[in-house]
């Protein structure tokens, strides 16, 4: 597992970066720009990402079917793909996700009668299977050296191969996302039996979903093909989660960006503007103090002063304390997982509640997080979530009270420098991730509509 890199005290690197960034942009790039940039990259542990292991084709095929099948949801109305669509780069382009009972699809989807938004944005699943230690925006699932920490504790079945499979166990247990409420009926008017299981009965929920799947002959055949040494009586939802993880690993790993090619010593892979942005990223802008390592993030948590929008969670509704919602994590109030930045250009809107639609807005926020939070204009929010903005003085003060130390002072980036940072972030895009429509199957074993 990659360690979390802390910003090194390398005065020589800092001086070199400062000198390069100060270069007059009306002239040719300095001849040593690549040497300076590579020195900075090395200082923050940014290395080429290793290829993921090839996955068994039958396992991937099963995982693909499960990912797109609404049979996994209590009301049979949503699938994993409802919030993680190929057409929106494996997210949903919504500021806040809309789970079971919603109306419409994609960016236009809204909560149905008696429903509300899921408290957080649906993050992209691109590159989710690369080996990041923390899953979900609050990191409530962790995976280190083959050992997992999850909300289910000892109820988590053995045999899960990786943290992505562990994560795949949980959306089906969440009432707002997929399971539904007691008294719900499914799309056929039948009682939602998954919703009748108690919230703490993890095993009961997973058994109920598995029972549904194994009532479909095509799934029985698909499970037998993917797990030939496991009898139907031994199958559990952990096998479904393993297949979903294999699908994500095989099909959603996209690591051939210009920056990846630059890491492999192709100096021409980045434009001069992108190189200037990279020097800012690893220098004056201090982005790399959080976004470091092979994935440029994903290895820690921070309160970065994001405006609070949404219905909130259990601890202090309507606020969302992020990692501070988890027991024993009071220090992390309003802190969320530091996002890995691969393909970030394609994954708007940004932050845990989707308050910013563009990377330019994100960079502007980081340039002076305190001011940006206190002057945030809710009119920039989509109208249907505008009423869930919590901009009172008490809330803003609470967020600022836990603001990460690296954002206490403005960065004082010029407009040109901010544009260069955005250009660098665009260099993290794998062109193959722009069109993922081929991942969507025409049909799924349940016969339900494919989202």
Protein language model annotation of sequence segments:
Residues 9-18:
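Bacterial N-terminal signal peptides
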């Amino acid at each position: 597992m990659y360690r979390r890199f802390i910003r090194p005290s390398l005065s020589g690197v800092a001086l070199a970066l400062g000198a390069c960034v100060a270069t007059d942009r009306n002239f040719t790039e300095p001849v040593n720009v690549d040497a300076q940039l590579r020195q900075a990259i090395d200082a923050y542990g940014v290395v080429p990402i290793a290829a993921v292991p090839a996955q068994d084709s039958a396992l991937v095929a099963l995982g693909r079917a499960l990912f797109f099948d609404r049979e996994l949801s209590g009301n049979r109305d949503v699938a994993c793909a409802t919030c993680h669509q190929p057409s929106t780069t494996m997210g949903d382009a919504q500021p806040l996700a809309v789970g079971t009972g919603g109306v419409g699809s994609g960016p236009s989807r809204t909560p149905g009668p008696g429903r509300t938004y899921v408290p957080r944005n649906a993050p992209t699943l691109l590159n989710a299977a690369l080996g990041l230690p923390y899953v979900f925006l609050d990191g409530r699932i962790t995976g280190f050296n083959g050992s997992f920490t999850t909300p289910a504790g000892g109820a988590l079945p053995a045999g899960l191969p990786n943290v992505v499979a562990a994560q795949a166990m949980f959306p089906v247990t969440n009432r707002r996302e997929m399971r539904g409420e007691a008294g719900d009926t499914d799309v056929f008017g039948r009682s939602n039996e998954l919703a009748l299981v108690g919230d703490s009965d993890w095993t009961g929920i997973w058994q109920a979903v598995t029972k549904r799947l194994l009532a479909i002959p095509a799934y029985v055949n698909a499970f037998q093909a993917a797990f030939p040494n496991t009898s139907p009586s031994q199958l559990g939802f952990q096998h479904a989660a393993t297949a979903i993880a294999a699908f994500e690993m095989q099909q959603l790993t996209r690591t051939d960006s210009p920056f990846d090619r630059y890491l492999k010593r192709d100096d021409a892979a980045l434009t001069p503007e992108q190189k200037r942005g990279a020097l800012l990223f690893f220098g004056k802008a201090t982005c790399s103090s959080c976004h470091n390592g092979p994935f440029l993030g994903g290895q820690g948590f921070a309160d970065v002063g994001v405006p609070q929008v949404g219905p909130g969670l259990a601890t202090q509704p309507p606020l969302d304390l992020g990692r501070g919602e988890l027991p024993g994590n009071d220090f992390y109030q309003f802190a969320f997982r530091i996002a890995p930045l691969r393909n970030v250009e394609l994954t708007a809107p940004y932050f845990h509640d989707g308050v910013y639609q563009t990377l330019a807005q994100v960079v502007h926020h980081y340039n002076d997080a305190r001011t940006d939070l206190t002057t945030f204009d809710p009119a920039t929010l989509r109208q249907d979530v505008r009423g869930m903005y919590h901009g009172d003085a008490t809330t803003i003060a609470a967020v600022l009270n836990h603001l990460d130390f690296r954002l206490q002072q403005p960065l004082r980036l010029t407009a040109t420098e901010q544009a260069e940072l955005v250009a660098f972030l665009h260099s993290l895009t794998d062109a193959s991730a722009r069109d993922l429509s081929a991942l969507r199957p025409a049909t799924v074993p349940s016969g339900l509509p494919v989202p």
